[in-house]
Amino acid sequence: MIVDTFTNRGSTFFSKLSTVLFFLCAVITFQGVIQRREVELDTPVYVHYAKYRSARFYHAFRNVRQQYAQVKFNMDADLSELWDWNTKHVVVYLVASYSTEKHEKNQVVVWDKILSSPEESKMFMKDTLSNIQAHPFNEYSNQFEGKNATYTLHWTVSPKMGFLSWGAGPGSYEIPFHKIITQPK
């Protein structure tokens, strides 16, 4: 019986290789947890207005008229501090926070963008409208009237190896929702 066959040597080699790679991944993940840095970015978002109207979207799960809001904003942000050697991509999103009678805190994503490289992390956006098709911002009580929302820029850093990290910039001042009155044709 031959003990040192090609199959046995290959099995031993790949067993040791997978063990080394496993411990290397564990060390990198542990290092990411230890060296996790809290990044404080001053990235204000200036919201011009938040408007709403009644509409019926047939692709929605309920075929009823609902109030949908749309937000127009400016943003000048430099998120390059979020990048290091282990960053795969950064997801940036604008969150509207408001309260209702039933719920103390409601948070809705009204805009998002995936940054795949550090060059994309310098963002200058002027008069940008939230996409009502990608992020339908509706209130199930159908009462945007009299409500104010605070808008905050959030980010999630996805590492190549390790755990997600996230953060948020300063919130804007409260912006009231304005109703759009459509003229009959």
From Swiss-Prot:
Membrane side Lumenal: residue ranges: 35-185
Function (record text): Essential component of the signal peptidase complex (SPC) which catalyzes the cleavage of N-terminal signal sequences from nascent proteins as they are translocated into the lumen of the endoplasmic reticulum. Essential for the SPC catalytic activity, possibly by stabilizing and positioning the active center of the complex close to the lumenal surface. Essential for viability.
Cytoplasmic side: 1-12
GO biological process entries: protein targeting to ER; signal peptide processing
Protein family: Belongs to the SPCS3 family.
Glycosylation sites: N148
Membrane topology listed for this record: Single-pass type II membrane protein
Annotated keywords: Endoplasmic reticulum, Glycoprotein, Membrane, Signal-anchor, Transmembrane, Transmembrane helix
GO cellular component terms, semicolon-separated: endoplasmic reticulum; signal peptidase complex
Residues spanning the membrane: 13-34
Location(s) in or outside the cell: Endoplasmic reticulum membrane
Protein name, UniProt field: Signal peptidase complex subunit 3
Record carries keyword Glycoprotein: yes
Lineage of the species this protein comes from: Eukaryota, Fungi, Dikarya, Ascomycota, Taphrinomycotina
Main subcellular localisation: endoplasmic reticulum
Record's keyword annotation contains S-adenosyl-L-methionine: no
Family annotation (Pfam families): SPC22 (PF04573)
Subunit structure, interactors included: Component of the signal peptidase complex (SPC) composed of a catalytic subunit sec11 and three accessory subunits spc1, spc2 and spc3. The complex induces a local thinning of the ER membrane which is used to measure the length of the signal peptide (SP) h-region of protein substrates. This ensures the selectivity of the complex towards h-regions shorter than 18-20 amino acids. SPC associates with the translocon complex.
